[in-house]
Structure formats: C-alpha cells, structure tokens
Amino acid sequence: MHYCLPRLSALASLSFVILLLAACRTMPPAPSGSQLPASQVQQLKNMRLAKQLPVPVQGIKRNVLKDTWGASRTSRRTHEGIDILAPRGTKVFSATEGLVADLRNNNLGGKVVWIMGPAGTWHYYAHLDDHKRGLSVGDYVKKGDLIGYVGNTGNARHTAPHLHYGLYLQGKGRGAVNPYPYLR
C-alpha cells in the first residue's frame, strides 16, 4: 500500500496544475485602449478639445487652485498634472466627454481613471478614494458625469486627500501638458 502514495501524490500534483492552467485560460484579458469601440474612438479624435474645462472636483473654484505642474518628485520625475485639494469623498467629475479607457489601482496613482477625450486627449484622475460604483472600461461619459471620489491612495497615502488631474495630448501617459490653464 505504501507504494501507491507516490503515484497518488503525482496524480494530485498533475491535477492541480491542470486546474490552475484551466483557471488562467478563462480569466478575462486586462482592459486596454484597443478594446474601446472604434467608432466612438474615431468620433472623439475628430472632435476639438475645449479651451476651457471645468474643475473636476465638486465645489472647488479655479481661484483656489495652485499650479503644481512641473514640481519635483521622487526618482527624478516632475509633476505631470495639478493637485486639487478637497476633503476625502468629495465627488470627482469628468472634465470632458469621452470613453473610460482604464480603471485600475497602481503604486503611484492609487485608484485611477483614464478617460480618452476629444482630439485623442487622455485625462488622468488619480489618488481616488474609490471609483464610481458601476463605472466600467468602455463606458461613455459626458462632461460633468461622476467618475469617483477624492482620496489619497497610491503614493499619496501620507498626504492630504486630493485629486491629481493630468492631461496628455499624444496618447495615454504621453505628451503631458499643464492642465491648469485649461481649468475654469
């Protein structure tokens, strides 16, 4: 009977590996910009970006904003956006219409939302306490739609709650421009 144990152990290990591989094959692929509806992407690319965008945090007026663009960051980085201070849980709205292109949690931005907007611009909302419940990649949002809530996730966990808002003209994370002059 003791000679059956190695055989059973090998079968159990093989079964585990097969189940693990099957589970990995059934997991959905990670969302990407290429999975967005092509017709809506083209429609957005054909639109012009407004010269004035609303401040995307509820109750915050432009005159209280501080231009934090270009400030030094760790690892020889510079700040590619503006930080908008507000109490945790304050509503964050889309500054433009567009497609929700990415929702994730990462080390730098914490909980983030990427929206592809007019003229192929990309709008980055970071350090969120949470995304709006039910918000999904591929959703079409209008200017002023709720997308999340102010927080201090990611590398901002030891700072006051705020929204980091970034604007990119050459693709997701490429061609950063100062969003401060756009916000009204």
Question: What does each of the following model-derived ranges do?
Answer:
Residues 25-111, 143, 177-180:
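Surface-exposed, glycine-biased beta-strand/turn segments
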Residues 56-58, 75, 107, 134, ...:
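Extracellular/periplasmic catalytic domains that process cell-envelope and extracellular macromolecules
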Residues 114, 139-184:
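Conserved, short, structured surface segments that act as functional micro-motifs
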Residues 20-23:
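C-terminal motif of bacterial Sec signal peptides marking the signal peptidase cleavage site
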Residues 67, 86, 102, 127-130, ...:
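A residue-level detector for short acidic-glycine micro-motifs
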Residues 2-13:
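Bacterial N-terminal signal peptides that target proteins for export
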Residues 95-137, 162-164:
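Zn2+-dependent peptidoglycan hydrolase active-site motif and core
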